[in-house]
Amino acid sequence: MSDFSITCSDFDEGAEIPKKFGYKFENEEPNISFNRPPSSTTTLALIMDDPDAMGAVGKVWLHWLQYHNLTESSPVEGKTDFDEIGYGGPAPPDGRHTYIFKAYALDTELELKEGYSKQELEDVMKDHILAEAKLTGTFAP
């Protein structure tokens, strides 16, 4: 059993995400930490989405998508539902939403190019996930 976890120095599990991380505010990336990945981990991946958006926009809204091969100096980011590459903070149109940050420890390096989709990431991660963890936070306009 892995002790893999994901934490954020900017807010606690289940707590309110500070406004500066909101898309319509400063849109700063929160300080996410991947803790105690399995020793055979070669890549860490992150998906941040908003399942509460289903009621407002008819789908789970993707806010952040990235992977980091541990042999590389920086992560490679995918395209969000804002049609932008990189972090797109919370921006609920209809009240308080819960945001889920899902972390994955993988046993293979990935070769997706910047701007990849969530489906592309999920497809290449399949059969390579060593451990998973999640962090939730809430945000209201």
Q: What is the meaning of each model-derived region?
A:
Residues M1-P141:
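N-terminus-centered regions that define maturation/targeting leaders and the start
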